[in-house]
Amino acid sequence: MSDFHHISVMAAEVIQYLAPRAGGIYVDGTLGGGGHARQILEASAPDGLLIGFDRDREAIAIAAERLAPYGERVRLVQRNFACLAETLDEMGIDAIDGFLLDVGVSSHQLDTAARGFSFQHDAPLDMRMDVSSGQSASDLVNTLSEADLARIIWDYGEERWAKRIAAFIVKRREESPIETTMQLVDVIKGAVPRGAWDVRLHPATRTFQALRIAVNDELASLEKALAAGVRFLKKGGRGVVISFHSLEDRIVKTSFRSFAQGCTCPKSIPRCVCGKLPLVKVITGKPVMANEAEVSMNPRSRSARLRAAEKI
């Protein structure tokens, strides 16, 4: 089990902006291999509490093994981070000092062929972060209407050839179900005109991203977790989010700005009647990006964007 690998992105920056301290209560909404969690525990020694979430039971198991030396300072939960509010309520915790969300798929999930996240390996077309529940990517591509497939591929993948890819998927599944990653890759390659292939981007990249987001309801989960995290933050507590593509980053940016906004009454009204007060101040004017040294060691960090906000 110890072969679970996931390189913690922007580790120093996470600690800088989260600013963990002794006695604090911190939530890591995306445990992965436990790298960020371990750093938070070290920075909040000797008595900081870490509550870790992950949908992936393999990630939970390896995190439990790796974080065992921290004993009762660690509580692990196999749940979507969208369940943050109800989980904290169940634990009797009414406020936290910080939360971290490192969203998207982990290096381990991408590199484990059997999980079906990658277009580089032939495997069952699954893509579920929690393999014990929900519909797989294969279920979606074989049952959704052409219009729904096109909408998902466009909305979640920002793929310009979404309609054509959806049409090719429907045509192909009429012959036999699309059950593996390479079967889907072949369909996509046939749908996207070769002259439109980007030398820097595999033609299946955006479609695979879109299906993964749809299978795991990632964007709605992110919005829900952000709202809950900000609500539970103590004054001075911080939320840190690392995203890897524009859809996620847009949600984080918009959410933090909304939480930082006060009165929304029209300017024509002389006195505020909405009663809305700012909840946070955004402490990253622009998204923080991985430095050149990190990108050279971990190319996947190139697309990482970190944003942070502090409760006021």
Swiss-Prot record:
One of its GO terms (molecular function) is rRNA (cytosine-N4-)-methyltransferase activity. Its EC number is 2.1.1.199. GO terms for biological process: rRNA base methylation. Keywords: Cytoplasm, Methyltransferase, rRNA processing, S-adenosyl-L-methionine, Transferase. It catalyses: cytidine(1402) in 16S rRNA + S-adenosyl-L-methionine = N(4)-methylcytidine(1402) in 16S rRNA + S-adenosyl-L-homocysteine + H(+). Belongs to the methyltransferase superfamily. RsmH family. This is Ribosomal RNA small subunit methyltransferase H.
